[in-house]
């Protein structure tokens, strides 16, 4: 393990919906990579307990997806609070990346950051203010070089750790096929 300012923090949250004012976080995972996107460590993958009442408010898509992938059952069986998950995640990150240097990395990370600001503010504050959002490259590729999109397919399990791994692989794909850089 090596604390390095060039390391990148990848994060994904699964939530009961998209509005942080009325929805909650139900899963969090993190991965740390080096600047070349090589995975250095996987952080804790944590299902966060939410009440049956909270889970019952999920829309049909969320309920179907999170039931089929087993997350609803994990959330019901979990006793972990959002604060406890935040602290475990911070303990992991502090071993790899100093505070305030890594952008938040992933797909559509501004959505994750909205939930972090609301429910895990100390973790939200750990990131640099910049974002490394893979979905930006996807949007640009769809407009400037749409054929590139055909070469990368996601499984879309909507489990946090799987989603992060796919985001890292997707960025590596765009690095080579859209930006035309080879890994050093």
From Swiss-Prot:
CDD domains named in the record: Orn
BP GO annotations: DNA metabolic process
Superkingdom classification of source: Bacteria
The keyword Nuclease is assigned to this record: yes
Keywords in alphabetical order: Cytoplasm, Exonuclease, Hydrolase, Nuclease
One term under GO cellular component: cytoplasm
Family per similarity comment: Belongs to the oligoribonuclease family.
HAMAP family (alphabetical): Oligoribonuclease
Biological role: 3'-to-5' exoribonuclease specific for small oligoribonucleotides.
Protein name: Oligoribonuclease
Gene responsible for this protein: orn
């Amino acid at each position: 393990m090596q604390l390095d300012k060039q390391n990148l923090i990848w994060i994904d949250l699964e939530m009961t919906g998209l509005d942080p004012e009325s929805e909650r976080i139900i899963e969090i995972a993190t991965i740390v990579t080096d600047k070349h996107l090589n995975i250095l460590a996987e952080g804790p993958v944590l299902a966060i307990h939410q009440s049956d009442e909270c889970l019952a408010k999920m829309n049909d898509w969320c309920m179907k997806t999170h039931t089929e992938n087993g997350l609803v059952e994990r959330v019901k069986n979990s006793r972990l609070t959002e604060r406890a998950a935040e602290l475990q995640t911070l303990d992991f990150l502090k071993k790899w990346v100093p505070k305030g240097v890594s952008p938040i990395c992933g797909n559509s990370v501004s959505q994750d950051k909205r939930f972090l600001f609301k429910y895990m503010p100390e973790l939200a504050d750990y990131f640099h203010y910049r974002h490394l959002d893979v979905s930006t490259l996807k949007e640009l590729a769809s407009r400037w070089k749409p054929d590139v999109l055909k070469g990368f397919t996601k499984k879309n399990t909507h489990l946090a750790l799987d989603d992060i791994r796919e985001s890292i692989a997707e960025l590596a794909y765009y690095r080579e096929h859209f930006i035309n850089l080879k890994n050093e």
